[in-house]
């Protein structure tokens, strides 16, 4: 509760199947899915009332107003009539839709349509919110607004966010689950996953080297493991990545050695890993990579 979890995997990994099982659209062939204490196979109605699902593609009824659509979703969820009006108003206010509540959904911008779909998922105050690609197709301003809304939701709900935009997941998620070929290959914070990729200290340097001295500079750098040309720029400068052992800061040695050799440094910066780097490494690994959380949980999934 109060956590935003990123759910990642390459195409065909099983993300959609997993979400369809959690939301009760597909019956699992084995194992159990427990939502707030309810087994979705044995008590589907009670389990589904704990879930708000916003599918990709924003499926709305174009002939309904915003308020009518959210009210209809409240009726489908079995919210009592005496509570319905108040709960609909609550989610319209929370999602910033009060001012457009009487507009037909077909006349809204894509950003507002995303909000309406999210309001439909939120009505009834479910414990778990599942969002499938909530910012796809939005302009930068709309993306910022939806991300801010998701962060607010994460304060009171468990939010499961499926997205192909890894920078988005890194920014707003507390934890990340990565699956590949139907198997969980990692469960950790974005920061820890990024740190696991950096098993060596790497530095990018952009230099002016007309005499190609960089080709033989490695033997003069004691702590350096590898030097690799990244690209040659139009201004005839060259960008290299220089790798050393983990926890070794090689920037001073690089600066002093290159200066001594007469190689002009235009730029030098540490190469930081991203969630995308971690994702690519994990999905290209044959065996699931163990992590501290999975070791602690250890039991039945």
Regions found by a protein language model. Give the residues of each.
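ABC transporter nucleotide-binding domains
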Residues: 1-180, 185-186
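Surface-exposed charge patches
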Residues: 72, 90, 219, 256, ...
């Amino acid at each position: 509760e109060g956590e935003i979890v990123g759910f990642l995997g390459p195409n065909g990994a099983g993300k959609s199947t997993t979400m369809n099982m959690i939301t009760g659209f597909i019956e699992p062939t084995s194992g159990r899915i427990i939502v707030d204490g309810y087994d979705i196979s044995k008590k589907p109605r009670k389990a589904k009332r704990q879930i708000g699902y916003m599918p990709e593609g924003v499926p709305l009824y174009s002939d309904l107003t915003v308020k009518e659509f959210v009210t209809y979703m409240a009726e489908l969820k079995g919210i009592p009539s005496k509570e319905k009006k108040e709960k609909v108003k609550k989610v319209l206010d929370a999602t910033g839709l009060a001012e457009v509540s009487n507009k037909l959904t077909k006349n809204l911008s894509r950003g507002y349509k995303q909000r309406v779909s999210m309001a439909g998922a939120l009505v009834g105050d479910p414990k778990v919110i599942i969002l499938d690609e909530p910012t796809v197709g939005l302009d930068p301003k709309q993306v910022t607004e939806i991300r801010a809304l998701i962060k607010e939701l994460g304060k009171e709900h468990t939010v499961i966010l499926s997205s192909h935009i890894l920078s988005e997941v890194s920014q707003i998620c507390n934890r990340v689950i990565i699956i590949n070929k139907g198997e969980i290959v990692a469960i950790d914070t974005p920061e820890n996953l990024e740190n696991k990729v950096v098993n060596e200290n790497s530095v990018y340097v952009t230099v002016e080297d007309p005499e190609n001295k960089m080709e033989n500079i490695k033997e003069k750098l004691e702590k350096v493991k590898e030097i690799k040309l990244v690209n040659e720029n139009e201004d005839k400068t060259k960008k290299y990545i220089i790798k050393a052992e983990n926890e070794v800061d090689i920037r001073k040695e690089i600066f002093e050695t290159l200066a001594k050799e007469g190689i002009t440094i235009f730029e030098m910066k540490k190469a930081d890993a991203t969630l995308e780097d971690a994702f690519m490494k994990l999905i290209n690994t044959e065996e699931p990579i163990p992590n501290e959380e999975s070791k602690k949980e250890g039991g039945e999934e």
